[in-house]
Design a protein with these regions (language model features):
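Peripheral, non-catalytic segments flanking oxidoreductase cores
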Residues: 1-306
Length: 306
């Protein structure tokens, strides 16, 4: 079967007009059942904010390695601060042995301090660990907070749309995201100065384990690819659009009616793209640490799998 990534304008849903909400929900349901990815417009996030984050992000990653290394997390808080080039590999999450990914990253977590609410759960501490913010370039820390808030609002709206698309009350997910531990990550894919190792990608093949992911991307070709029917197809959103994909949690919520799809970031094959660098910023939506991830009542059918 030949798939394409559906392009969906969610503005008609956000305006609140019943017909528009129904149309958007139907489009989202179709995309969620077939490919699990959406090219999203009408999201309301200013392009100027995204471009500012890209610009400042490039400046941050241009800093000397020893300065960036000062932001590396100490202890178990793995989703905070700076992580250097080829120090992490996402293919390991699916049990694949491959070289580490050709990217460096800056991770940023919840702004609101919810750690006390989950102090009784030993493993929750890392989910609500303090952020490690850069002080260079000037204002980058403020931009990160502003963009996190914008993604946070969009994710809440998307969950409203997803609820309607899954034939649930619009506010079904809302109580589950009041103390979320969503992660925002800025990934820098530098120009390749030498050939990659065999099997080494910019980001190895994986699925996202949260509820949903929002991605802003820019830079050279040879980027995001989505797997369907054993093949891979590129995702190249137009300027101003975002990419949204479902995570494993949403697949469980919907009893596997909706799909969390394998994806990767390829290493460019042609010299021009390989010598160009790119940056992406992803927001990985995770509900409250104690949220129950169980089959939605509308998706049980002949029985819940989860």
């Amino acid at each position: 079967m030949n798939y394409e990534i559906p392009a969906i304008d969610i503005a008609p849903f956000l305006t609140g007009e019943p017909k528009g909400k129904a149309q958007v929900a139907a489009q989202v349901a179709s995309a969620a059942e077939t490919i699990g990815f959406i090219v999203l417009s009408g999201h309301g996030i200013p392009q100027s904010l995204i471009e500012k984050a890209f610009e400042q992000g490039f400046k941050f990653f241009d800093l000397p390695g020893e300065k960036k290394a000062k932001l590396h997390p100490i202890g178990p808080a793995k989703q905070r601060g700076f992580h250097g080039l080829a120090t992490r590999g996402l293919s390991a999450t699916i049990g694949k042995d491959a070289p580490k990914d050709l990217r460096e990253s800056l991770f940023f977590g919840p702004i609101d301090d919810h750690a006390a609410a989950f102090a009784h759960i030993p493993d929750a501490a890392t989910a609500y660990a303090p952020n490690i913010l850069p002080d260079t370039p000037a204002g980058f820390d403020v931009t990160l907070v502003d963009l996190y808030r914008a993604f946070e609002k969009l994710a809440a709206n998307l969950l409203r749309i997803f609820a309607v698309a899954a034939r649930m009350p619009e506010d079904h997910f809302t109580p589950m995201i009041q103390k979320h531990f969503s992660i925002m990550s800025t990934h820098h894919y530098p120009a390749l100065q030498e050939p990659p190792l065999p099997g080494q990608l910019r980001t190895g093949a994986h699925t996202d384990y949260g509820a949903l992911t929002i991605l802003a991307m820019t830079g050279a070709n040879g980027g995001l690819e989505v797997q369907r029917d054993g093949g891979w197809m590129p995702v190249s959103p137009p300027k101003g659009a975002l990419v949204v994909n479902l995570g494993d949690m949403m697949q469980r919520w919907t009893n596997s009616r909706w799909v969390s799809t394998m994806h990767r970031v390829m290493t460019p094959e042609n010299l021009h793209d390989a010598m160009s660098r790119r940056i992406s910023i992803g927001y990985f939506m995770h509900p409250d640490y104690d949220a129950r991830i169980e089959c939605l009542s509308s998706c049980k059918g002949d029985g819940a799998k989860f």
